[in-house]
């Protein structure tokens, strides 16, 4: 879903946008930062120091966690590296990283099972997004597995997805 600042442009992949993913096992709600964003947008999002990036991710993750707490949804970050034989070809996926950003921070409420700390996942995202040599897409948001999220069968899921997207605002308007 294109955002206001992308209105009137021929290609929504020049700007961050809202994404809903419908999968066999889950529904995703993400803010997507596509490979095609301008260098000025990319630098405002990623060309900050690693601590500032981690702080932005922490704030967004805390807001997502609060917004989905009673749904059994899961905060997620995803990075995908793709290549295309031609502009209109189906992409070949070279790499995918999808993880719960709460693994990077010790300050979130306890979960069952307990989230194990692995801040290196976030370090890897920062490293690849600031030293990219390929077609990379970044996403932050939440996923809702069908088997654990009964809210998916109710209209309330629309409000939950809205809360996820609003929580991700620092990755849409980083200033």
Language model: regions and residue ranges:
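Intrinsically disordered, low-complexity regulatory segments enriched in Ser/Thr/Pro
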Residues: 6-58, 130-152
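Compact, glycine/acidic-enriched structural inserts
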Residues: 25-108
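Surface-exposed peri-terminal alpha-helical interaction modules
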Residues: 1-5, 13, 107
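Long, solvent-exposed, polar/charged low-complexity segments
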Residues: 82-175
